[in-house]
């Protein structure tokens, strides 16, 4: 199929709704000798609901444990493909930053060239939104690879350090990440679930904080940003109450480019700015694990 015919067919058919699963690569495979120029995706071709029910079965693919995760399809520049017997060789690099409910990937795309040595992963439960971010990363990687080495548009790392996966982070975080693996976790403009009976579906709860504390290393930072004051107070209350998190005064992070990106780089954050709305920020540091008392 010619390049033009393939592109036209994809636009007519719309984005694929297949689940990215555990081993989907942001870069689609090409036949030998074929060159396909990828288009920057347009959101209007990716229909999606504003929110998803996290308690239903979304036919998700996830590893039984972190060491079984094939990251080679997400970060081909850093991980080898599985061995012939299906076993996976763990590389030196590990995913260290996770954007939970990454939406259209604004934060990931902003941070990737600023911190090219950090592997970042967006976790998104909506199929079409995940597909959009997958296509966005693939198109951006290809565009970077085609630039001359001395181009002013060349970005450090070429976006090889960023990927996205369709996942329910409320259920499967420990399936993807080992204890203390993550350095940063972002919860940016999450679903507020206003009704009291829906509060159990909020992304920050006492039970879920235990999961996040497990995968976040001591000294790591958990970022929350929202335009809903009630949700901000809810998240801050539960984080303050958790024994493994300590509050970081926002003013101490005033010069932090990561927090600035968390506030402004996401599509939701930009919409709040256009509407001149408020943004509520709370960041917490993971404490050291308590030492076990010696038995007498």
Curated annotation (Swiss-Prot):
Top-tier EC class: transferase
Active site: 191
InterPro entries from the UniProt entry: SAM-dependent_MTases_sf, Trm8_euk, tRNA_(Gua-N-7)_MeTrfase_Trmb
GO cellular component, one term: tRNA (m7G46) methyltransferase complex
Listed pathway(s): tRNA modification; N(7)-methylguanine-tRNA biosynthesis
EC number: 2.1.1.33
Residues annotated as binding S-adenosyl-L-methionine: 101, 124-125, 168-169, 188, 266-268
Gene Ontology molecular function: tRNA (guanine(46)-N7)-methyltransferase activity; tRNA binding
Catalysed reactions, as listed in the record: guanosine(46) in tRNA + S-adenosyl-L-methionine = N(7)-methylguanosine(46) in tRNA + S-adenosyl-L-homocysteine
Keywords: Methyltransferase, Nucleus, RNA-binding, S-adenosyl-L-methionine, Transferase, tRNA processing, tRNA-binding
Cell compartments where the protein resides: Nucleus
NCBIfam families per the UniProt record, alphabetical: tRNA (guanosine(46)-N7)-methyltransferase TrmB
Recorded family membership: Belongs to the class I-like SAM-binding methyltransferase superfamily. TrmB family.
Function: Catalyzes the formation of N(7)-methylguanine at position 46 (m7G46) in tRNA.
Subunit structure: Forms a complex with TRM82.
Protein known as: tRNA (guanine-N(7)-)-methyltransferase
Source organism per UniProt: Cryptococcus neoformans var. neoformans serotype D (strain JEC21 / ATCC MYA-565)
Lineage of the organism: Eukaryota, Fungi, Dikarya, Basidiomycota, Agaricomycotina
Gene: TRM8
């Amino acid at each position: 199929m010619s390049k033009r015919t393939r592109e036209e067919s994809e636009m007519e058919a719309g984005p694929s709704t297949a689940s990215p699963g555990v081993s989907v690569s942001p870069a689609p495979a090409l036949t030998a000798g074929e060159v396909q120029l990828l288009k920057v995706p347009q959101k209007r071709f990716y229909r999606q609901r504003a929110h998803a029910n996290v308690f239903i079965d979304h036919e998700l693919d996830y590893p039984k444990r972190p060491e079984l995760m094939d990251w080679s399809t997400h970060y081909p520049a850093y991980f080898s493909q599985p061995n012939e017997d299906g076993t996976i060789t763990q590389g030196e690099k590990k995913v260290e930053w996770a954007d939970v409910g990454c939406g259209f990937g604004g934060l990931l795309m902003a941070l990737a060239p600023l911190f090219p040595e950090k592997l970042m992963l967006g976790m998104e439960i909506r199929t079409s939104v995940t597909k959009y971010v997958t296509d966005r990363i693939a198109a951006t990687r290809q565009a970077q690879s085609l630039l001359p080495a001395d181009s002013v548009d060349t970005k450090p790392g070429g976006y090889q350090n960023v990927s996205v996966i369709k996942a329910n982070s409320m259920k499967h975080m420990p399936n993807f990440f080992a204890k203390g693996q993550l350095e940063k976790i972002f919860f940016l403009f999450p679903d507020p679930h206003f009704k009291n009976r829906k509060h159990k579906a909020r992304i920050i709860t006492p039970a879920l904080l235990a999961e996040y504390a497990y995968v976040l290393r001591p000294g790591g930072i958990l970022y929350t940003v929202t335009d809903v004051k009630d949700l901000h107070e809810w998240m801050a209350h539960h984080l303050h109450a958790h024994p493994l998190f300590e509050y970081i005064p926002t003013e101490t992070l005033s010069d932090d480019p990561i927090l600035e990106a968390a506030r402004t780089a996401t599509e939701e954050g930009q919409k709040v700015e256009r509407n001149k709305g408020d943004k509520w920020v709370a960041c917490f540091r993971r404490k050291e694990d308590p030492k076990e008392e010696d038995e007498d």
